[in-house]
Amino acid sequence: MQPPSLLLLLLLLLLLCVSVVRPRGLLCGSFPEPCANGGTCLSLSLGQGTCQCAPGFLGETCQFPDPCQNAQLCQNGGSCQALLPAPLGLPSSPSPLTPSFLCTCLPGFTGERCQAKLEDPCPPSFCSKRGRCHIQASGRPQCSCMPGWTGEQCQLRDFCSANPCVNGGVCLATYPQIQCHCPPGFEGHACERDVNECFQDPGPCPKGTSCHNTLGSFQCLCPVGQEGPRCELRAGPCPPRGCSNGGTCQLMPEKDSTFHLCLCPPGFIGPDCEVNPDNCVSHQCQNGGTCQDGLDTYTCLCPETWTGWDCSEDVDECETQGPPHCRNGGTCQNSAGSFHCVCVSGWGGTSCEENLDDCIAATCAPGSTCIDRVGSFSCLCPPGRTGLLCHLEDMCLSQPCHGDAQCSTNPLTGSTLCLCQPGYSGPTCHQDLDECLMAQQGPSPCEHGGSCLNTPGSFNCLCPPGYTGSRCEADHNECLSQPCHPGSTCLDLLATFHCLCPPGLEGQLCEVETNECASAPCLNHADCHDLLNGFQCICLPGFSGTRCEEDIDECRSSPCANGGQCQDQPGAFHCKCLPGFEGPRCQTEVDECLSDPCPVGASCLDLPGAFFCLCPSGFTGQLCEVPLCAPNLCQPKQICKDQKDKANCLCPDGSPGCAPPEDNCTCHHGHCQRSSCVCDVGWTGPECEAELGGCISAPCAHGGTCYPQPSGYNCTCPTGYTGPTCSEEMTACHSGPCLNGGSCNPSPGGYYCTCPPSHTGPQCQTSTDYCVSAPCFNGGTCVNRPGTFSCLCAMGFQGPRCEGKLRPSCADSPCRNRATCQDSPQGPRCLCPTGYTGGSCQTLMDLCAQKPCPRNSHCLQTGPSFHCLCLQGWTGPLCNLPLSSCQKAALSQGIDVSSLCHNGGLCVDSGPSYFCHCPPGFQGSLCQDHVNPCESRPCQNGATCMAQPSGYLCQCAPGYDGQNCSKELDACQSQPCHNHGTCTPKPGGFHCACPPGFVGLRCEGDVDECLDQPCHPTGTAACHSLANAFYCQCLPGHTGQWCEVEIDPCHSQPCFHGGTCEATAGSPLGFICHCPKGFEGPTCSHRAPSCGFHHCHHGGLCLPSPKPGFPPRCACLSGYGGPDCLTPPAPKGCGPPSPCLYNGSCSETTGLGGPGFRCSCPHSSPGPRCQKPGAKGCEGRSGDGACDAGCSGPGGNWDGGDCSLGVPDPWKGCPSHSRCWLLFRDGQCHPQCDSEECLFDGYDCETPPACTPAYDQYCHDHFHNGHCEKGCNTAECGWDGGDCRPEDGDPEWGPSLALLVVLSPPALDQQLFALARVLSLTLRVGLWVRKDRDGRDMVYPYPGARAEEKLGGTRDPTYQERAAPQTQPLGKETDSLSAGFVVVMGVDLSRCGPDHPASRCPWDPGLLLRFLAAMAAVGALEPLLPGPLLAVHPHAGTAPPANQLPWPVLCSPVAGVILLALGALLVLQLIRRRRREHGALWLPPGFTRRPRTQSAPHRRRPPLGEDSIGLKALKPKAEVDEDGVVMCSGPEEGEEVGQAEETGPPSTCQLWSLSGGCGALPQAAMLTPPQESEMEAPDLDTRGPDGVTPLMSAVCCGEVQSGTFQGAWLGCPEPWEPLLDGGACPQAHTVGTGETPLHLAARFSRPTAARRLLEAGANPNQPDRAGRTPLHAAVAADAREVCQLLLRSRQTAVDARTEDGTTPLMLAARLAVEDLVEELIAAQADVGARDKWGKTALHWAAAVNNARAARSLLQAGADKDAQDNREQTPLFLAAREGAVEVAQLLLGLGAARELRDQAGLAPADVAHQRNHWDLLTLLEGAGPPEARHKATPGREAGPFPRARTVSVSVPPHGGGALPRCRTLSAGAGPRGGGACLQARTWSVDLAARGGGAYSHCRSLSGVGAGGGPTPRGRRFSAGMRGPRPNPAIMRGRYGVAAGRGGRVSTDDWPCDWVALGACGSASNIPIPPPCLTPSPERGSPQLDCGPPALQEMPINQGGEGKK
């Protein structure tokens, strides 16, 4: 090669390298300019740039015009969006080379340009046929786009859907381009280029090493002695000097410390940290910034015009401080790196500093002068010329216009133009304009109804009263004349005013001082003295107080002497003296001897208040009137002798005796004479016991003075003593020192007073000052009153304590400077006088600031006015008159002298100046202003002044008259007195005489009658003042006008239910009710607690306490708690709150009762709920029948057995050191606890497989139905409820368990058999509900709750309806029906015990009880059961129980009697032979059982697939598990599915009454219950059981076809037709499942009915209770014809979702329904829809190995790598479930193998865990696997769920269906398995669709005799879901041989009917399930598939079947 050629080649290579390394993007400053169409290039980092396009252009280089520039492009308010062409290299359809546009239309419009009005918000083309449209809540349509499309109307390609980014790049959709976020090591638009790290500067490897580039990374080739990714490790120990620059040396232990590493500080690198790298190598300094290297960083030194860390921020020069950049008003505009000035007109230059000469280009006319101005010019015209350019002739020289008009020249035509003065018109403005005449054709110029008066050049308005102004536009301010009295506020009103008077003044003008004494405020005849704004009361003696209302108690000072009693009187007192005293104060003693009361000869002795006669000898008595020896005083023969003032009767011998026997009376101070006492002097009384005069014996002690009384005496005690005889020492309280109602309390040193709240002080003499605490707010003044206080509020506040803000008004006088106030809704408004402003007119205006004076003067303000100081040469008020004569002034203005002054004014020379003498009505320096005659305010007393042409007119306020309203009229004329007061005129006003009850100047005030306290104090609650009256509100127990009458509160009989009423004064109601037994409450209206101290609400059960002395308790239902069952149910499971105490961790479990929990506890808290042992207070609560969770533990015998079903120690016999109670049922095996004594560790050590999912629901539905289901007769399936027990081996009385459960009757009906099955599965023994001799379930109400119940009653669906009514309604507290039931269950223990060592289960009932007690103790039993289990009683079955149940809750005698009767019934029942023919049929309420006339074989249908749709096509009890494909179906809550029994070949369609014969179908009588009247038309929508209508029954029974329903409907074709024609409702739905007739037509595959229902308006999108639409039901039932009908309906929502989010497409993919997946995709079903677990239809197809559906979904755009909520892909599910075909399909399309789920598992990992070796080989890339399956050794060879072929010798254990089995080796079968659902071949080729036993009683069709072809030429595959035939052994005309021994009995396989009525049988051909027989080799069931002659293909052991 020649050297020039070599040189040329090198040059080409260099150019190529430069082009390769050149960065992508634009380079600003290159040639040519990169930005087109005026775009600006902006530099970015790394030298790249971007174009900022000018308006109207777009694109990367602004190369495209913006189509949205046209504002009319999108019509009707649509928004326009420009769409750029797709970039090159993207996977998109061919796009145009010019941009397009997209119009986003408003709701209601559509079209490419939104030009069409849209009736339907979602037209078919709205989403561009690439998505589905649905309407949002706001009414706007919204599109759900298909994969690969995006945008509001799915019009944009989603370029990221194809994942264009390679090498792990993440695609970011930025339309119309994409952006790939590349991982480290890759770059490029699609991350397609590998970054060569070795070319970087500096390189990644240190000096002295070699760099080798790798894909996405690099590798450093280290010399000897260095190692590490970057050769950073050096051999040898750390050098003594260490590492440079502060680095840390660290030995590498993983290299045996033979290498060391320097850890460098920031800013240094290198093996020894010796290098400071240049950080400026890759700096990002922009815009000319200089990089300055630093330590581990760099700094950008920016030029002056840029700032920021990378000099990328522009400095805004326009905002910098300093002198402005732009002068002369120029505007500064910032730009990138600079600025520029936008100058105003006339200026130029960089900073607008140059003044441009505008006269250079001016065009002024010749002869004119141009004058330059700023930004303009002006032309100075010569005389006679005018115009802007002086180009027009001045037409005004001849003065053609009126003198007051303005003349100008028209700039266009050059003619004269007159601008008229106001009020004139015409060409020359000489014509007067009649404004009032114009008002007749339009609005009047005078407002508010003013009258218009035309004047020359103007008009005047005659205003109505109250208005003023030139146009009556202003409200006249009547307050301008200041009519109100000084100190008051004038309120301006419309045509009047109102004076707001201050306190103390009144009257219309506030001119009258208020007489506060007019209302007679002073009491007790006091004199009132009027004050200003107040009064003073001059009290009479004896009264005090502000109003003399307090009567002074003159008796306080004890003014009465000598024991006189003081009586207080108003203003005085009165002394009631004792006898013997007199005087005003009883101070004078009366001398009773002055009147000589004693007879002559007797001496009078004066005594205090009495006298005493000293009788002479021989006389006695008070007045000495009785002789001592009176006649007949002595007896005969006795002699009367007077001895010492005493008469003695002496016997003849001189001795006193000889008294007769009858004189034996007792005389104290006298002698007995003739049986009566003759008293001594001074004594009296029957026995002379009373001292006459009293004082003779000196009874008064301590020197007291005695005063005799008629009945005794009275002692006047000296100071310090008191009492009747002065014997008591007087205390300090005796004198009553406490005043004002205070109570006196003696004390050792004297006394102390307890004062009432109204007074205080040592003697309660001072009124309490309530104002001390300042209770008034907002500046209010506190006024103290007796016992209370009041607040006088400041201005603007109100309320009892002035706490409320008062809306301001003119009453607050807010206006200042004599302004006028006007009230308005917004508050007061002040009308300010001239010169003032502000809200309150408080601010003096600066009048000179408005420049009222011209430039030739100075303004000087004085107060609210101003005047002008004229400069030399000017004069006038405004200095606008030149200082010249009239002649000169007119000449200077070019007018006549007569026109100098306006309005006819006369110009008068005055010295050097002149002035205008104005005519009347005008003013001003030139007479230019009209004079306002009202300006001087001539009208008085609030009158309104109205200007008139000739003066003014005053409109007077009411009460005034005269020219200026100065004359006052009669003040009473306006009737100012209110409330019928009498008005009397007086000078200056009036006087109102008020009637009683009213006060005030105008009698406007109502007297508060309650001030005098008229109500009775003890019976009054409150006094209410009324208008001139009052009302007393009485306390309970009082009545009357003044509440003075007491009433009997018991008179109205307030006590209910026979309660006794007792009146009490202290109770709140005034009475107390003594209630009878059973009632309580204040009025005995509440029923007493029925359970001890509590009511059992919400169906709770009352249980007696087994512990003596403890009250009964409530056992609550449905999760309620608390002593009364009122506590709402707490969250089940783990809460919150967590049920585990002391930081225990909680895990949830499942069961019938909802989620349960299991606690994992720390060692210090080992209880079931992590409670600590030995809790306080547990001893007292142990054994009380209530489980206390805190006391439950082995230490306290599980709360004395309360928490363990009454068993104190369930683990009795288990070694205590093993702590097995703590390990029981914790999910882990503990060998030390795996024994019978330790209850088998709760079966944790063995986990046999659960019941096959396909059989679990079937076994649930057929549990204990009287038929042996061999596939269900396993421990994991519940032993079939004991149906398979041997007939002959049962004892007469078998083992049993009696359970006490708390369930409501409806719940018991629904959950009874579920309860038995759950316990059977839990205990692993056979359990069933026993029946009595009449075949009824042995279920009895709990005797303790309803003792009156008879044991004959059993479980009854109408239990609640038949309950006996209450004899007395109890309102809301009526207890619900009994929730407690005793359920007796039989137990099959034949497979347990020592005889069966392989079976580990409890072998006696006692062990069962211990096992259940242990589960209850650890909390594992409650969540498994539907309700609480309170007690269990086992019975071994050897003899009937003789005693009552030995548990605490059944301890009453009634319970014992009942249980004895229960035992007798059990014995009689078990003696009889058990019937095996059929199970008991329970019919729902409303159905009646038709009596059987003849026996018939029983038929039922076995399960046919794991989806179990055929078992019960109703709402599933359990939703589809997220990880499985099993969709268990069953009855709805509250729904039972019965089995209709077949009675031979059916001839009728049995409905509600199950009676034969359709009758006359058009009348629809057979479809409705009995009508009330035969004449009434039948109700076509009558509801039957579960809400079933006749239309539903007709759809269920089906359409008439050949071979189907022989004799159905008695020849009546299509039974729904007459119903729909008669108006039957097609939208009705059942109560339980919510299914409509269209649902039933889909479920039973009735295409004719479905079509007819759609025509009748049935809603195809109506969901049932599970959210399923008819399309869901049709897909699930494989009703293809119905599916096609629904898909053809435009109303059908193909993407409707159930409650779990399942769409019909997901259901079809999951159930492998043939062809429906493709049909749904063709109907635009969303292939990317997700359910609530995040799974798509492709996930479900992969999970069930539906390769056909998966292929169709992938072809429709399904995402092959979609991840669900657990981040599992379809490939992951295929690997987990062993779906080889789907996995091959996905791997062939490049599905990601390494995507992991949340647990970090990849598809290969889960395939390895599940032993799917064939899939593992696929995933590891070894190619497609062969048909093989490696069996792993183990117990029974382990499960093989995916064998491809079936061996005849290998049956599934238990029969049933084996989901997805592919290979079964000989002798190795899955336990609990069944028929293979995914096998590619089957033994018998039956009809695929529309026939078989699974098509709901329809006939089989299309089955070729002898195994001929099926309809449509298809061969039925077991992999198909939906209705599929069984491998049945057929006979009859189909030539099918018997299966078991050559014959199949029709009695063996009774038909299982659906819930909605009994349909006719498909035919008389029995369809048995797989024949299951025991295997003699392995003891497991075998699959007997009939003779091989009928098989279409041989089944080879270990190989594929060939067709």
Swiss-Prot record:
Its main location: membrane. PROSITE patterns: ANK_REP_REGION (PS50297), ANK_REPEAT (PS50088), ASX_HYDROXYL (PS00010), EGF_1 (PS00022), EGF_2 (PS01186), EGF_3 (PS50026), EGF_CA (PS01187), LNR (PS50258). Keywords: Activator, ANK repeat, Cell membrane, Developmental protein, Differentiation, Disulfide bond, EGF-like domain, Glycoprotein, Host-virus interaction, Membrane, Notch signaling pathway, Nucleus, Phosphoprotein, Receptor, Repeat, Signal, Transcription, Transcription regulation, Transmembrane, Transmembrane helix. Synthesized in the endoplasmic reticulum as an inactive form which is proteolytically cleaved by a furin-like convertase in the trans-Golgi network before it reaches the plasma membrane to yield an active, ligand-accessible form. Cleavage results in a C-terminal fragment N(TM) and a N-terminal fragment N(EC). Following ligand binding, it is cleaved by TNF-alpha converting enzyme (TACE) to yield a membrane-associated intermediate fragment called notch extracellular truncation (NEXT). Residues 1347-1371, 1485-1508, 1900-1927, 1968-2003 are annotated as: Disordered. Residues 1-23 form the signal peptide. ANK repeats lie at residues 1633-1665, 1666-1698, 1700-1732, 1733-1765, 1766-1798. One of its GO terms (cellular component) is cytosol. Residues 24-63, 64-115, 118-155, 156-192, 194-232, 234-274, 276-312, 314-353, 355-391, 392-430, 432-473, 475-511, 513-549, 551-587, 589-625, 626-659, 661-689, 691-727, 729-765, 767-803, 806-842, 844-880, 882-928, 930-966, 968-1004, 1006-1044, 1046-1085, 1087-1126, 1130-1171 form the EGF-like domain. Pfam families: Ank, Ank_2, EGF, EGF_CA, hEGF, NOD, NODP, Notch. LNR repeats lie at residues 1170-1213, 1214-1250, 1251-1294. It comes from the Eukaryota. Residues 1489-1502 have a biased composition (Basic residues). Residues 24-1447 are extracellular. InterPro entries: Ankyrin_rpt (IPR002110), Ankyrin_rpt-contain_sf (IPR036770), EGF-like_Ca-bd_dom (IPR001881), EGF-like_CS (IPR013032), EGF-like_dom (IPR000742), EGF-type_Asp/Asn_hydroxyl_site (IPR000152), EGF_Ca-bd_CS (IPR018097), Growth_fac_rcpt_cys_sf (IPR009030). It is found in: Cell membrane. Belongs to the NOTCH family. PANTHER family: NEUROGENIC LOCUS NOTCH HOMOLOG PROTEIN 1 (PTHR45836:SF23), SLIT HOMOLOG (PTHR45836). Heterodimer of a C-terminal fragment N(TM) and a N-terminal fragment N(EC) which are probably linked by disulfide bonds. Interacts with MAML1, MAML2 and MAML3 which act as transcriptional coactivators for NOTCH4. This is Neurogenic locus notch homolog protein 4.
